[in-house]
Amino acid sequence: MFSEKLLAGRNILVTGGGTGLGKSMAARFLELGADVHICGRRKSVCDETATELMDLHGGRVTSHGVDIRNALAVDEMVEAIFKDGPLTDLVNNAAGNFISRTEDLSSRGFDAVANIVMHGTFYVTHAVGRRWIANKLRGNVVSITVTWVRNGSPYVVPSAMSKSAVHAMTMSLAAEWGRYGIRLNTIAPGEIPTEGMSKRIKPGDEAGARTKAMNPMGRVGTMEELQNLAVFLISGGCDWINGETIAMDGGQALAMGGNFYQLRDWTDTDWEKARDQIKAQNEKDRSARQ
């Protein structure tokens, strides 16, 4: 689909690049000739991913153990990257989400999502963007959001609010920074199953089962489709796309709203079971970080 070295000479940072969607996009960028930086809280995971991707595709992947909720740590990482060679592109992928009745949410639960998705995404975008402007460099930012930035979603209110903030940031900075040759766009994918996220927002379901039943195309999305859209947006194939949120969900948002309204019929027992499964996944993730 793309020429073999389409991204040669590009230097791309992918947040949350050690696993899941971020890892997949990083792999495709590397395969197409880019130098890639990945960051995440678990440095060991990012190191393993960097080694794995370079073994598969060659090239250069640099890993950074950074919590993007920490603005100072983000700025130090970006400064170090720019000293080695300025970034050309940023992919804001790091995220967090879980389902909950909003009346059951704690402030800690809300902050766990908002601090990563809203604050963290801004911190990274700001640190990269102001260096592009100071050095008179063009750049591209692609952020991963959700289809419900347009219509909201019950039962994932921290994510709906935070992703909508990223959507607003994208439109606002596209207008403000466009004159510097800096473009910002977002991809709003439907369900592309990953282990951790699937167990937090669709606990108990077979991966993709609900989407397959409700989606006009009768299936979930694929990593390859996300990779291809991300590559297109940063490739320069159409530099006049700026400030857009592109849904990639098989038409589910159009047909069904693309959100979690269907959970209105859950009983207290259903919610208790979901909480237990989410807690188990969180414990598993904490153990992996130790």
List the predicted regions and their residue ranges.
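Conserved glycine-rich cofactor-binding loop
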Residues: N11, G16-G20
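Short, small/polar-rich loop/turn modules that mediate ligand/substrate recognition or access, typified
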Residues: V91, G178, R183, I241-G243
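Substrate-binding pocket helix/loop in short-chain dehydrogenase/reductase
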Residues: R101-T102, S106-A114, T211
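Active-site loop-to-helix junction immediately N-terminal to the catalytic Tyr of the SDR YXXXK motif
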Residues: L105, G152-M161, S172, M197-R200, ...
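Active-site helix of classical SDR
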Residues: T125, S162, T170
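Alpha-helical segment proximal to the catalytic Tyr-Lys
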Residues: R130, A175-R179, D239
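C-terminal helical subdomain
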Residues: T186, E206-I241, M248-G250, I278-Q290
